C-alpha cells in the first residue's frame, strides 16, 4: 500500500479528541466528516466547514467531531472541532487522491484512533452518483459513469478526476468500527445497490436519491442534531433539518425547495432482497426479464416514465438508469404481488422526503430547471418538460433508487453497466442473473 507522506504540524496525543475530565472513559459518539472537495465544490466546502465550526458550539459535550478536509487551495488536513474551536491534528505534505481506498482507509483509521468512542457515525461530503461503477475509479470518457468522491489529486478544480466505487467504499468501511449511521451529502447516493453493499457497516444509511445543491446541508443547525442520543429518531431529525426551512437552497435557487432524500434501516435489506427476488420471479417468463419503465399515458399530462434520478451520461443527458424502486415495481407487478412486496420496502425505508410534483406547483420544484440564471446554465434533466415525464406522489415515490437492466446500457455506459452491476451483491441476490441478464 502506498503510504501517504505527511507533515505533523502539532503535537499529537493518543486520544486527541478526548475530554480530559473523562479520564479513561470513552466519549459517547465520534462524528467523522469526510470532505472530498479537491474539485469544483471546493468553495462550497469551505462555507460548510465554517458552518460546522458554528454548529459545534451546540454539539453535545459527550461527542467528538473530527473532520478531514481536502480542498483545491490547501494541502489535505485533519482537524478536531470543539465548542467553536478547531485544532489541526495532521497536515499532509503533499496532495493525493482522497478517493483512493488506501488513502481513505488510512485517514479514517487515523480519525478513529485519535477520537475513540463507544459509537461512530460518518458523513461523506462531495460528488456522488450512487451505484454507478467506474474502471479502477477513473472516468476518462464522456460515457463514463462514476460513484463517490471525485478528486483531482492536486490543488486544482479541474483535471483528471478519480472516484471510488461504492463496492470499494464498503470494503473500506468494513475495516472500521461499526457505524450508527453513514450519511452522504452527495448526489444520488441512496440506491438499493449501495445500501445493500454497506448494510453490514452501518445501522442506517441517509442519502439523497437525486442531484443536490453544491452548497450542501446547513451544518450550523445539522451538527448539533448529529449528537442527539435517540438513534431511532435521529435519521428523521437529520432529514427534516436537511430539507427544512432553514436550508440555504431556496434563497439561491428560487424554484428549489426540497430534494428526494431518505433513511434506510440496513437490518431490513436482506428481507427486502428476498421479497424482491420473489416478486421478480413472478414476472419471469423466459429469455430476459424486461421491466417496463414507461407507464401508459392516458392524457398529455400523464407521466410517460417511472421516476428516475440519473442518466447514462450523467445527470443531464443520456438514458435514465437509476429509477425509483417503488415506482418500477408498482408499474410491473400485479396488484396482489405489489401489495405483498411493498411492506418490505416500507420497513427498509424508514423515512423519506420529496418535493411537490410539478403538476401541483406549476414550476420545476426539484432544482433550477428552465431558468439559466439560477446557476448560470439551464439544467435540461430538471426542465419542466423532463419533470413532467414522471409523477412524484406518495403512491409513486419510495425513497430508494435501483438499476433497471436495459440493453441500451451496453452501448451507452463505460464500463458496460449490464456487466458492472454484477459487482454488487444486490444484483445476484435478487436474481438478475437468473432472469436472463
Regions found by a protein language model. Name each.
Residues 32, 48, 103-104:
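A short beta-strand-loop element at or near the start of a globular domain
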Residues 32-34, 125, 403-405:
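Short hydrophobic segments within beta-strands
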Residues 69-85, 92, 96-177, 186-188, ...:
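Catalytic-core segments of thiol-dependent peptidases
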Amino acid at each position: 500500500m502506498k503510504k501517504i507522506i505527511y507533515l505533523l504540524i502539532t503535537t499529537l496525543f493518543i486520544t486527541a479528541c478526548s475530554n480530559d475530565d473523562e479520564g479513561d472513559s470513552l466519549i459517547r459518539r465520534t462524528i467523522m466528516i469526510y470532505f472530498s472537495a479537491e474539485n469544483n465544490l471546493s468553495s462550497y466546502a469551505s462555507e460548510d466547514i465554517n458552518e460546522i465550526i458554528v454548529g459545534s458550539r451546540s454539539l453535545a459535550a459527550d461527542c467528538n467531531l473530527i473532520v478531514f478536509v481536502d480542498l483545491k487551495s490547501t494541502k489535505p488536513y485533519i482537524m478536531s472541532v470543539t465548542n467553536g474551536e478547531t485544532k489541526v491534528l495532521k497536515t499532509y505534505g503533499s496532495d493525493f487522491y482522497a478517493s483512493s481506498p488506501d488513502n481513505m482507509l488510512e485517514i479514517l483509521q487515523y480519525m478513529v484512533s485519535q477520537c475513540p468512542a463507544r459509537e461512530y457515525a460518518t458523513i461523506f461530503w462531495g460528488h456522488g452518483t450512487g451505484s454507478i461503477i467506474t474502471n479502477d475509479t477513473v472516468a476518462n470518457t464522456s460515457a463514463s459513469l462514476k460513484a463517490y468522491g471525485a478528486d483531482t489529486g492536486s490543488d486544482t478544480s479541474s483535471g483528471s478526476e478519480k472516484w471510488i466505487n461504492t463496492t470499494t467504499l464498503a470494503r473500506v468501511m468494513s475495516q472500521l468500527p461499526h457505524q450508527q449511521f453513514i450519511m452522504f451529502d452527495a448526489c444520488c447516493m441512496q440506491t438499493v445497490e449501495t445500501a445493500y453493499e454497506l448494510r453490514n457497516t452501518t445501522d442506517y444509511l441517509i442519502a439523497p436519491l437525486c442531484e443536490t445543491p453544491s452548497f450542501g446541508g446547513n451544518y450550523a443547525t445539522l451538527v448539533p442534531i448529529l449528537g442527539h442520543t435517540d438513534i431511532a429518531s435521529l435519521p428523521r431529525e437529520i432529514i427534516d433539518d436537511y430539507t427544512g426551512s432553514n436550508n440555504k437552497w431556496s434563497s439561491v435557487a428560487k424554484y428549489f425547495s426540497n430534494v428526494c432524500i431518505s433513511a434506510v434501516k440496513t437490518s431490513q435489506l436482506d428481507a427486502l432482497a428476498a421479497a424482491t427476488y420473489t416478486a421478480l420471479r413472478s414476472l419471469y417468463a423466459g429469455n430476459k426479464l424486461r421491466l417496463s419503465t414507461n407507464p401508459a399515458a392516458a392524457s398529455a399530462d400523464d407521466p410517460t416514465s417511472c421516476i428516475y434520478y440519473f442518466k447514462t451520461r450523467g445527470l443531464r443527458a443520456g438514458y435514465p438508469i437509476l429509477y425509483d424502486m417503488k415506482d418500477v415495481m408498482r408499474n410491473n407487478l400485479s396488484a396482489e404481488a405489489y401489495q405483498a412486496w411493498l411492506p418490505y420496502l416500507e420497513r427498509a425505508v424508514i423515512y423519506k422526503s420529496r418535493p411537490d410534483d410539478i403538476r401541483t406547483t406549476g414550476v420545476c420544484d426539484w432544482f433550477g430547471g428552465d431558468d439559466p440564471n439560477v446557476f448560470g446554465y439551464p439544467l435540461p434533466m430538471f426542465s419542466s418538460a423532463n419533470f413532467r415525464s414522471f409523477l412524484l406522489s406518495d403512491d409513486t415515490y419510495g425513497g430508494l433508487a435501483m438499476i433497471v437492466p436495459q440493453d441500451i446500457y451496453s452501448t451507452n455506459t463505460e464500463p458496460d453497466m449490464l456487466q458492472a452491476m454484477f459487482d454488487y451483491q444486490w444484483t445476484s441476490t435478487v436474481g438478475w442473473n437468473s432472469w436472463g441478464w
